[in-house]
Swiss-Prot record:
Pfam families: PPV_E1_C, PPV_E1_DBD, PPV_E1_N. The lineage of its organism: Viruses, Monodnaviria, Shotokuvirae, Cossaviricota, Papovaviricetes. It is an enzyme of class 5 (isomerase). This is Replication protein E1. Residues 598-626 are annotated as: Disordered.
Amino acid sequence: MADKSGRLLGGCSFVLDEADCSDLEIDSDDESDKENVPNGQDMCNSFDAEFIDNAPLAQGNTLALFQSQVAQAGKQKVNYLKRKLHLESSELGTVGRAVLQPVNHSTPAAKRRLFECSSSENEVSYAASPAAANTQVFRNQNSGSVGGSSGFGSQASVSQSQQNSNLHLQILKSKNSAACKLAVFKFVYAASFCDLTRPFKNDKTTNYQWVAAVFGVSEELFEASKQLLGRSCTYLHATCRAHEKGSVALLLLSFHVAKSRETVTNLLKNLLNLRAEHMMLQPPKLRGVTSAMFWYKMTLSPNTYTWGQLPRWIEQQILITENSSEVLKFDFSHMVQWALDNEMMDESSIAFHYAQMADHDSNARAWLGLSNQAKIVKDVCTMVHHYQRAIMRSMTMSAYVHKMCERVNVTGSWLVIMQFLKFHGIEPIRFVNALRPWLQGVPKKNCLAFIGPPDTGKSLFTNSLMSFLKGKVLNFANSASHFWLAPLTEAKVALIDDATHACLKYCDTYLRNFFDGYSVCIDRKHKNAVQIKAPPMLLTSNIDIQAEEKYSYLKSRVTCFYFNDKCPLNEDGKPLFQITDPDWKSFFERLWQRLELSDQEEEEEGDENGSRGTFICSTRNSNDFT
């Protein structure tokens, strides 16, 4: 309110605009004083007297409010601890039920409740076993399984068939059946299935040995399957353990032939009358001491049925021998000696065949355990090339031919070669007389040329001789490279097959010294050029060198043989003349003296260094010394 001058009067700001004022409430004794006091100030004093109440107030029920707040805070702390520790629920009060509501996950198909309610129809909880600590496994407590509880109490005994059915339902109803089976297996056998096996992703991959974990198997069918599985296995390991959730069987099968996971699954389905979802099949882990000890200890149990001899991969890892300390030690020289004795010159062949020896060779097993296998194979191949090149250079042509003859164990007929030469009108004695200086590397007699039209057997004849003498074949398509002649540094003989005008022109320009049989210099990739004596060479072509005037410098350096008739074929379309390594062996042994090859017994007596003997490059063990 404001006075006539417009000032606000103190203490009247709380008065409502539409406050009711009654003249009856004013005492008659104050009428005389009211005339001397302004109207606005008198109204404010009246409201101040009625609004302010200085009377004492009652405390109210604050203690009950405090107790309810404390109880609610305690409930929240208990709920937090239960959610954190995954404890089972108990009877909750009315206040707690409003807070502890089901928690919905992002996946609508699988719902999980924080706490159980005893009055609910279907009650779901998590398995509290140690094996399932990391895996969530659902169980239905009203299904009648042992250990399950319901609102009416737990059952004391359940039949085995009902246990197996409950285990099947548990596996089928679980969100992750693989995790459910792994958890049950680990709980029953106290070992992880993944530690005993190695994974195969493809069901079509075949293997001789398989590990099978079967859940909910019937005892009668399991006992009957032992005899049936023994017929198709070299080794059978079968055990079955009963559990409150159902029986779990473990099988180690070693078949006569390799089988896929699909085949083994169908076999067990028919024998045990189970579905594929109730099985786990993987091949065993062959290189693990833990896995081998598990299977060995299981065989000692009276509840385990075994048939056949224990697999070798288990014996090797559990048996202790006097050389057990040397098993893991790899000897590089032994691998080089093996590759040299078996004439392994290719990296892929060395790696593949040496890995196959791991079953009976401790050095091969040690090599497989190394992480730098590829580097070792490359180094072995390099060393074998060095040794073979040095051995070949130290041998004469007579010793080399004799070695090639010893390599062939089968006896052939030298008449096949003679008949082939007669078929083309070549006198055998003329070919033998030309072959003698060719083997000796006589200058101007170092190249034999076989000339004729196509399909006359030129390549058949020359390639069979290269196969017997382990010669090198040069391809003129690589002539653009400076290193296309590098194979001659590791060859005793060489062949240029199907030479055209371009090839003959190149030979006439650059390879005259090669055809002469003199020393030549050959460039090698990433290595220094090497000087060697040109090896004897064979040449096949459809062009008559003697009739071409532009090849006049090659005429005196090449001895020509003409194949004019087409090579006959049999009913199967194969050449009628089949010249093999045994045939060439018989040819050289028959004409050894006529070819003027030296006697090997005399060479061995005159060889003081013993180069003809077996070359030993491996280190000796302490047991080798006497």
